[in-house]
Amino acid sequence: IRLSGSAVPFLLPLMFQLSFGYSAEESGWLLAPIALMSVVFKRFIGHILNILGYKTTLILSSLLMAGSTVSMSWLDTSSSTTWIICNLMWYGACMSMIFTSINTLTVGDLSQAQSGVGSTVLSIVQQVGIGFGIAVASIILTLYRQFMGNDGDALQHAFSYTFLTTSVFAIALVWILSYLRKTDGDHLRKKR
């Protein structure tokens, strides 16, 4: 999850500043839709999980996240702010759905006595995953920049190919999630 998920918030401000010529402040504000949509979408995730179940929700949200990451590869200096914001909101909703689902599934079977330790371990794994995802994205971007160049369109293409490459990790996640049983997490759902 973190290989693809952590790459996007790392790559976007770099792309906005280095390739699009935005200021650091503008780049920061452009990331706000990710956080906003993550919070807003949480309201609907319980309903989605109750209807679709954990396996289907996780696979669907991973495919949608891959799609949102691919769509970021289409961004360029002529992209409208509205298009950029819509892409980021789409990504924020996907990330919210994935992380809410996976976190609930991860600690859902722990007893109350184990839940504190489980949450701590989950937090540590997430932090390591964030660092790993950023490192991998950085290496991929560096390789593309060395191969394609650092100026103008070449730099933009390097970012685009990096987004495409990181979307492959989301597709790999779908393969991993396919090993979940359809009934995994059923005890956490409110069935209709």
Residue spans for each PLM region:
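Short, Lys/Arg-enriched, Gly/Pro-containing loop segments at transmembrane-helix junctions
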Residues: 149-151, 183-192
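12-transmembrane solute porter fold
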Residues: 1-146, 155-185
